[in-house]
Amino acid sequence: MGLSAAAPLWGPPGLLLAIALHPALSVPPRRDYCVLGAGPAGLQMAYFLQRAGRDYAVFERAPRPGSFFTRYPRHRKLISINKRYTGKANAEFNLRHDWNSLLSHDPRLLFRHYSRAYFPDARDMVRYLGDFADTLGLRVQYNTTIAHVTLDKDRQAWNGHYFILTDQKGQVHQCSVLFVATGLSVPNQVDFPGSEYAEGYESVSVDPEDFVGQNVLILGRGNSAFETAENILGVTNFIHMLSRSRVRLSWATHYVGDLRAINNGLLDTYQLKSLDGLLESDLTDLAILKDSKGKFHVTPKFFLEEANTNQSADSITLPQDDNDNFAMRVPYDRVIRCLGWNFDFSIFNKSLRLNSGNAFGKKYPLIRASYESKGSRGLFILGTASHSVDYRKSAGGFIHGFRYTVRAVHRLLEHRHHSVTWPATELPITQLTSSIVRRVNEASGLYQMFGVLADVILLKENSTAFEYLEEFPIQMLAQLETLTGRKAKHGLFVINMEYGRNFSGPDKDVFFDDRSVGHTEDAWQSNFLHPVIYYYRYLPTEQEVRFRPAHWPLPRPTAIHHIVEDFLTDWTAPIGHILPLRRFLENCLDTDLRSFYAESCFLFALTRQKLPPFCQQGYLRMQGLVSTESLWQHRVESRLLRDYAPTGRRLEDSSQQLGDQEPLGSPLAPGPLAQSVDSNKEEL
């Protein structure tokens, strides 16, 4: 009886049951979204996914978020500024100068609450990221190292395949969309004779006492190289810094990834001839040899080849050169490699076709302007590793830049997979000027990701209203309708922030006389960051975007307007900023965008066949300012309106209101009375 009852368990149904219950053979959990890495970019995407109520998981190899910052930068000082005071209460404006905070709805999760230092300690960033994940309840699986990623084709999947992730324990995870936010983690190494003698930035001592009285050679010329030099500048005999390219100063290139002033002490001692120095040479043209005393000698590689040795500096006479004053003829005690970082491609199967970009060697994966891999649909690169889109152009490789590009990617996917159109505000055309003025004066995404993210204004039929879309990737402009779910049938404006085209570069003198302009007619020659408005009658095509003029962020527009640069980055001057902008918009739309008092609208209604939009959308709908005696008098005195009251009544009213302060018969508004449509002041 017992045997007969147990027998079915060993038959085909029982076998299937056993297979289904076996953990190693069970179907892996399937999620809509997977995020690799719980650094700033990964947590930022997790926040947006959670707010949208999406199914997601974050995989982090370390026990806490932000593991990169537990070790780097090696000398513990961040170069992202923590400007706690701006004199403004506007939270969006303040993010322009907060380079460390992630975006969230919780004001407690601003980095200003975690450090008072202008250049914070990396430990504060670790603490901040931990609180960000914990406070918001982000779904992070810690101590989970994804060791392999491959594809599994499936017609039912969103993108025609699922991403299969295998962790260090052999557990398998499936997801429809994969976000890679692992940063750049592989030290860049150049192979040349003697390269094995170089200590890496990732492992070299950070104790200055270890360098006392030594001659040091640093390979590289980025912030990590100068950071290393700054730490030991006061204890070494001298420091020589060698790189194939000239030094790039961030204040000259306007790129925050170039050398920052906080690390440039070596430039002082070099130019003031205090033993330290900079040298330019391709590392592959040199060789480093070690002598019997443990000293390192640098020589041109072809001399080494002629001597037919690569073992010891004692076997040939060093240094060798055509001249006897070879710059690096003194031996070095230490050689330190600070050549930057590359993306780790090792965990990705070839089926993903996650190739490196040709222009960047192995540094970055090849992605589109939408941050999606060119090889696999549904695979997105976030954070520092996505910097190929705007390398040395904008801030996309840093927190204060990629927090906005991550949001843009999330918005693209909300429409692609959940039919949620790109967020937009629809307003009457009378609000067009004020909407642009507000955004260029406070928007942080436009300000930080200049030339990459831009606001797009989609005009409605007959230009009676518009939709305002914020921070759209401008290189995807031709696909705007497909990517956002919005229509651009009646023309559009694009608001971008730009530096002058000839103002940025490692060889530029950015402190020359007359480096800025202040007159409206010279706005197109503005050098410093300023708003530029592009008008298109039709949405540009992909071909127009691809073959746009050199160094232009967008195709040639129907019309273009530069708002003149401002020393205070405050574009609210009525005559210098707002009036030229409004006139430009009016010319593009062939309409009047001024605001009018009710009396003017009443006059227009009696004398014109077509009213200005402000009167159509306001006055005729019983909207606008309610007239009072004091307001009426102010308008007349300001010559915004003609005083149509009978002369006797006007004089009588004037006498009653002014008493002995004004002679009887003196006109209320000095000078010729002007119609409202001709008033210069009403132009404001």
UniProtKB/Swiss-Prot annotation:
Q: Which domain of life is it from?
A: Eukaryota
User: Which residues have a glycan attached per UniProt?
Assistant: N143
Q: What's the chief localization of this chain? A: endoplasmic reticulum
> What is annotated about its quaternary structure and interactions?
Interacts with SEL1L. May interact with OS9 and DNAJC10. Interacts with TXNDC16.
Chain positions of motif Prevents secretion from ER: 681-684
One Pfam family matching this protein? Pyr_redox_3
An example GO BP is: ERAD pathway
Q: Where in the cell is it found?
A: Endoplasmic reticulum lumen
Q: What does this protein do?
A: Probable flavoprotein which may function in endoplasmic reticulum associated degradation (ERAD). May bind non-native proteins in the endoplasmic reticulum and target them to the ubiquitination machinery for subsequent degradation.
- Region annotation (Disordered) maps to 649-684
Which Gene3D superfamilies does this one have? Answer: FAD/NAD(P)-binding domain
Q: What organism does the UniProt record list as the source?
A: Homo sapiens (Human)
Q: What GO molecular function annotation could you give as one example from this UniProt entry?
A: monooxygenase activity
Cofactor(s) needed, names only, are: FAD
Q: Name one GO cellular component term.
A: endoplasmic reticulum lumen
- Per UniProt, the ranges with Low complexity bias are 663-674
Modification note? N-glycosylated.
Name by which UniProt lists this protein: FAD-dependent oxidoreductase domain-containing protein 2
Q: Which family does it belong to?
A: Belongs to the FOXRED2 family.
Q: Which UniProt keywords apply?
A: Endoplasmic reticulum, FAD, Flavoprotein, Glycoprotein, Oxidoreductase, Signal
Q: Span of the secretion signal?
A: 1-26
